[in-house]
Swiss-Prot record:
Domain of life assignment: Eukaryota
Enzyme Commission (EC) number: 3.4.23.-
Protein name: Probable aspartic-type endopeptidase TRV_05382
Signal peptide: 1-22
């Protein structure tokens, strides 16, 4: 994993909570709709930017630049990818609280996967350290001969058994949900102590359980909703919202612009018809991209990233850190993606992702990939209201109100 002369590893999770989780805004039984508000936690963990890039590239099976691979896979005194900070320098993280059986865990809602996997009591004790744990032996029913595995080319991953158990998100319970209980995780997963697993909102046929694929949590509640949709209204430096079964028109401006979804690979994938960097429009550049709430960065074609960073004085592709960087005191230009006639504008401040510790250099929230499809992650989503509609399927986009 990563290493640097100017930080000390800090593995202990020292978070505290500052916002309670919102319960459903209405009774699902009578309205077919409900809302989840992300939970804000303050933690003394600070992610190293190249490590976060490594996570996104690895998840989407993209080639790793040598520097990113070296930083992410080096196992040494700084192997956990965190830096020590003082109490006044804590980070804020936004997570989603879920109850499985009698256990409460923090998970990522992830449109880029269809697996519902969590840290469990079946892991070795060292892998459970600083995580909230699911205890399937207390409330779950094991699915015989059903297993799962997530693996990447660099040797990282997770694997385990499958149990049926009740799973409740924002008070809405699925009484018999397939939960993928980890029996093994690589140390890179174990070191991510802010969350305890993933609840995938991709398509059911992308689920990784074998020999019989299992329904996602959303797949199990979809028929109980007013409409087969969920929306994401994620925020920059604030808790965001997921709405289920309806479109909250108070959260967006204007009419959403829709694109058809190609779900053949299980992703929320579509084709965009252009982009803008600063005042430069490129309305004929079409590219495919996956919309992924579980990835921090937006991983875009090299032609787009090079054009964007060419507008920023002092920007460079930093080979030591494996990505595009720039002076932290720089005011970044806007970036936009064209969706039919709608330009989805990303403010420059959303692209200034993080300062590299010990320097005056910041790491960009837009980074390059050479292979299609691209990935639109948090740096894009935190300015947009996005509709994920299983009727079609299709996605709608509008500016946040």
């Amino acid at each position: 994993m990563w290493h640097s002369p100017f930080f000390t590893a800090f593995t202990l999770f020292l978070g505290f909570f500052t916002l309670t989780l919102a319960l459903p805004t209405n009774s699902l039984a009578t309205t077919g709709r409900f809302t989840v508000e992300q939970r804000l936690i303050k933690t003394f963990e600070s992610n190293w930017p190249p490590k976060e890039l490594w996570r996104g590239l690895r998840k989407h099976h993209r080639p790793l630049p040598p520097a990113v691979s070296r930083i992410a896979t080096h196992r040494g005194p700084s192997a956990n990818g965190t830096v020590k900070v003082t109490p006044d320098e804590y980070n804020t993280e936004f997570v989603n609280e879920i109850t499985i059986g009698n256990n409460t865990l923090f998970v990522d809602i992830d449109t880029g996967s269809s697996d519902f996997w969590v840290f469990s009591s079946q892991l070795p004790e060292r892998s459970q350290l600083n995580h909230r744990i699911y205890h399937p032996e207390k409330t779950g029913t094991k699915l015989s001969k059903q297993i799962w595995e997530i693996g990447y080319g660099d040797g990282t991953g997770a694997a385990g058994n499958v149990f049926l158990d009740k799973a409740s998100l924002a008070g809405l319970e699925v009484p018999s949900q397939a939960v993928q209980a980890a029996t093994w995780v690589s140390y890179q997963f174990a070191d991510q102590t802010v969350t305890d697993g993933v609840i995938g909102f991709g398509f059911d046929h992308f689920n990784g359980v074998t020999p019989k694929k299992q329904k996602t949590w959303f797949g199990n509640i979809m028929e109980r909703l007013e409409k087969p949709i969920f929306t994401a209204c994620l925020k920059h430096k604030a808790p965001g919202f997921y709405d289920f079964g309806f479109i909250d028109r108070t959260k967006h401006i204007g009419n959403p612009s829709y694109l058809p979804v190609d779900n053949s690979r299980g992703w929320w994938e579509t084709t965009f018809n252009g982009f803008s960097t600063g005042r430069n429009d490129n309305s004929t550049y079409r590219f495919r991209a996956v919309v992924d709430t579980g990835t921090t960065f937006s991983l875009l074609p090299r032609e787009i990233t090079e054009q964007y960073y060419s507008l920023i004085t002092g920007s460079t592709f930093d080979r030591e850190n494996g990505g595009w960087t720039f002076p932290c005191n720089t005011t970044l230009p806007e970036f936009a993606i064209h969706i039919n006639d709608y330009k989805a504008i990303v403010p420059g401040e959303h692209i200034n992702w993080a300062q590299i510790p010990g320097t005056n250099t910041c790491f960009g929230g837009i980074q390059s990939v050479d292979r299609s499809p691209a990935v639109l992650g948090g740096s894009f989503l935190k300015s947009q209201f996005v509709i994920f509609d299983h009727d079609g399927p299709k996605m709608g986009f509008a500016a946040q109100r």
